[in-house]
Amino acid sequence: MRQGRTYLKTNDQVEVIAGKDKGRVGKVLRVLVDKDKAVVERANMIKRHTKATEMNQQGQIVEKEAPIHVSNLQLICPECTKTGRVGKKVLEDGTKVRYCKSCGESVESKS
């Protein structure tokens, strides 16, 4: 499998399309390009048990997000608010942008 080719970026709005959190919508917190995975806000939550230490007398159970493979995520277009596939194209001025294949609009952040 080809690695390092992902269409997701940090702060993108995505929907989980497969797995235990199917249908959940969240923001991408981190993209792991080398593993083709992304961490999505409040999706794929796991529990980690921490041992008691001298500084932290009690052990505890910590819930945190685990990475999800990018094939199980679909980007939500900010223009048409639908989930869909994303393409990449080069504009006339030479800049590369991602675009929604259903409405044709750019999905890049307006900053």
Curated annotation (Swiss-Prot):
It comes from the Bacteria. SUPFAM superfamilies: Translation proteins SH3-like domain. CDD domains: KOW_RPL26 (cd06089). Coiled coil: none annotated. GO terms for cellular component: ribonucleoprotein complex; ribosome. One of its GO terms (molecular function) is rRNA binding. The keyword Ribonucleoprotein applies. Disulfide bonds: none annotated. Keywords: Ribonucleoprotein, Ribosomal protein, RNA-binding, rRNA-binding. GO terms for biological process: translation. The keyword Nucleotide-binding does not apply. Part of the 50S ribosomal subunit. Belongs to the universal ribosomal protein uL24 family. PANTHER family: MITOCHONDRIAL RIBOSOMAL PROTEIN L24 (PTHR12903). One of two assembly initiator proteins, it binds directly to the 5'-end of the 23S rRNA, where it nucleates assembly of the 50S subunit. This is Large ribosomal subunit protein uL24.
